[in-house]
Amino acid sequence: MPLSYPHFRKLLLLDDEAGPLEEELPRLADEGLNRRVAEDLNLQLPNVSIPWTHKVGNFTGLYSSTVPAFNPNWLTPSFPDIHLHQDMISKCEQFVGPLTKNELRRLKLVMPARFYPKHTKYFLLEKGIKPYYPDQAVNHYFQTRHYLHTLWKAGILYKRETTRSASFCGSQYSWEQELQHGSTSLNDKKGHGTESFCAQSTGLLARPSAGSAIQSKFQQSRLGLQHKQGQLANGKQGRSGRLRSRVHTPTRWPAGVEPSGTGCFNNLASRSASCFHQSAVREEANPSLSTSKRHTSSGHAVELNSLPPSSVGSQGKGTVFSCWWLQFRNTEPCSDYCLSHIINLLEDWGPCYEHGEHHIRTPRTPARVTGGVFLVDKNPHNTTESRLVVDFSQFSRGTTQVSWPKFAVPNLQSLTNLLSSNLSWLSLDVSAAFYHLPLHPAAMPHLLVGSSGLPRYVARLSSTSRIHDHQHGTMQNLHSSCSRNLYVSLLLLFQTLGRKLHLYSHPIILGFRKIPMGVGLSPFLLAQFTSAICSVVRRAFPHCLAFSYMDDLVLGAKSVQHLESLYTAVTNFLLSVGIHLNTAKTKRWGYNLHFMGYVIGSWGTLPQDHIVHKIKDCFRKVPVNRPIDWKVCQSIVGLLGFAAPFTQCGYPALMPLYACITAKQAFVFSPTYKAFLCKQYMNLYPVARQRPGLCQVFADATPTGWGLAIGHQRMRGTFVAPLPIHTAELLAACFARSRSGAILIGTDNSVVLSRKYTSFPWLLGCAANWILRGTSFVYVPSALNPADEPSRGRLGLYRPLLRLPFQPTTGRTSLYADSPSVPSHLPDRVHFASPLHVAWRPP
């Protein structure tokens, strides 16, 4: 007969009718009983042929393909002019006085941040924008390209101009070395020569459609300038096959010519006369061409002609355009859906390329990307705006893996000890928090994103319209991209983007100027930065509380009026150092703070309502007596694990699920086990703040017996059979709690001190979690433990009670602790203010 739920509750001692604890509790440690209960509840599932369930509610498991939803009406979020002031440290010192070593160390980490991995893989530009939405490829391309352009305009990205220079918008930092008079001087000994930088150059193309013929004729690679064929010439490829294996994509493409999939180099002898003809036509039409000289590494000086931006797009009909987009203007439409119909909608499509306000030196940056990008909804509650996802996963796996620094995440008890109080609370919203922290330009070559341009992107997605080297630039190849889908997509995009369609159709390479979200270093840096800022605020206003985790920043004060004045002062301080706050999203919580998924009040901590609703919904949909895929179990455990500390039996109740996930087996919920879990999560108990106190109750055990010291009283007992020492120590602690009711118990066992009961026999772990709920433990060495003698059966010998004070810990979360306004004179060997010694004490 299967075990019913009432019997199971009684077995776990969750009912008041249970017998003496000293007799009942050791029984739960029996392996045979645990095995029989597991079999009754079907917790050890044999391999069965019943098909697994791969979906429970919103949780999906193995073999499930979730099709991402693309929103063609996504809005690109706007980014404020984010510029963290370089003199932030001096401004903080004006605000609060000399900074502590902890604060200085953290602020220096991000001014600027550095990221130099040992190995970096570079990918072709075609992988710059991921084909995440195959049915909406063109829409996704332009929306992503618009997002990248917005980030560049906001000063968050660098734009690669040449191999060793980049441009950006916004305010400049001192570590960003400006190019002197438009030239980058490189070391000739290394074979680089001197590279003359012209304002119209770009990461891939030296100039749009109206560039000079000389520039079209020569193509630069790492081997110097290579001669190139004319736009419509039919010469041979020359040495392209031999060079391609080494160079892949040239450092700079000729003016306006879209690079093909592999690049194309040509022999000096195979150049066409059409280049010289174009040169003559353009020089007649544009007398304002400016000329600059380029010295190559091979010693040749080549004149490069560059145009003022105003002359772009205003060429005569006789000109042969080398810009893929503008070439359609001079061709006959191939069909009703020819792209030439769209190109002829405007006379002036604007420049092929834009350049930033500042041009700086960079380390050698190849014409490649190191990560792909795609768009998703901003969050589950905001599907109108998009969010850019950057995939730099190469730094988290394989040979290019980087070991990220670890940092403190406040656990539930530390958070409760720190924030559970009778203060009034509000939370601040930092706009684009990650994009506040500047990166050193030397990190740019490792964090490259970009796009290959529309023709190559479309060609990659369409097998019928691939651009081949031998037909590159021919009219037949030009119209091979024309299709109804592309035509309709571009026509719709033209209504929103207008002439930016032309700009976005060109290739671009961008490097991060601020820390990106897709790299494991970024959360660490953000946590260090916000903790240092909160430390400064705490010391400036010692009667208040400022706390942060990542970009969540909360302020607490004793009254609402006090909180409002604090809010004004802190907001002004944050704005003065360049931190942008979204004041519209400031939330005032009253006395119950909502933070990190918890509600924290003077009574303790509970999970937020939306998490409780999710749990109820999960239990409604969990099937009984059906094997559930272990991947689905992972999602269920993730949800239930968050709220486990608020239940009677805690994490031990979930151990059968953990075991099935570890074994990668399916799990079957029996009616009794599901009812047990359901009841556990329907009644949640708050986690209370620990109080300081003096330990008066001690417990100790040997494999055969237990002993207690409660004040001046001593007790002892024996076990029916010898038990493992950790199990015996846990039983002794449970007896001490049940007999004395004390919430402060001294023990010499580290496993009991850790309060993790998942390694004990399952039934014992569940029962002990409920008995010891809310109990704090203090470590006492065995030699000084007053319960040591009773546990060995000797009651006659009395050891005096220790004066053992307990101080609640806030872990390593108290980095913003009360600190002296000037550094104290510590011994020379102490180089930092330990957070353990300067911990903030709750009011």
Swiss-Prot record:
State the superkingdom: Viruses
> Which portions of the sequence form the region Spacer?
178-346
Note down the stretches annotated as region Polymerase/reverse transcriptase domain (RT): 347-690
UniProt note on regulation of activity: Activated by host HSP70 and HSP40 in vitro to be able to bind the epsilon loop of the pgRNA. Because deletion of the RNase H region renders the protein partly chaperone-independent, the chaperones may be needed indirectly to relieve occlusion of the RNA-binding site by this domain. Inhibited by several reverse-transcriptase inhibitors: Lamivudine, Adefovir and Entecavir.
Where is the site labelled Priming of reverse-transcription by covalently linking the first nucleotide of the (-)DNA? Answer: Y63
Q: Where is this region: Terminal protein domain (TP)?
A: 1-177
Query: What Gene Ontology terms describe what this protein does at the molecular function level?
Result: DNA binding; DNA-directed DNA polymerase activity; metal ion binding; RNA-directed DNA polymerase activity; RNA-DNA hybrid ribonuclease activity
Its keywords, alphabetically, are: DNA replication, DNA-binding, DNA-directed DNA polymerase, Endonuclease, Host-virus interaction, Hydrolase, Inhibition of host innate immune response by virus, Inhibition of host RLR pathway by virus, Magnesium, Metal-binding, Multifunctional enzyme, Nuclease, Nucleotidyltransferase, RNA-directed DNA polymerase, Transferase, Viral immunoevasion
Q: Which HAMAP family match?
A: HBV_DPOL (MF_04073)
What is the role of this chain?
A: Multifunctional enzyme that converts the viral RNA genome into dsDNA in viral cytoplasmic capsids. This enzyme displays a DNA polymerase activity that can copy either DNA or RNA templates, and a ribonuclease H (RNase H) activity that cleaves the RNA strand of RNA-DNA heteroduplexes in a partially processive 3'- to 5'-endonucleasic mode. Neo-synthesized pregenomic RNA (pgRNA) are encapsidated together with the P protein, and reverse-transcribed inside the nucleocapsid.
This protein is called Protein P
Q: Which gene encodes it?
A: P
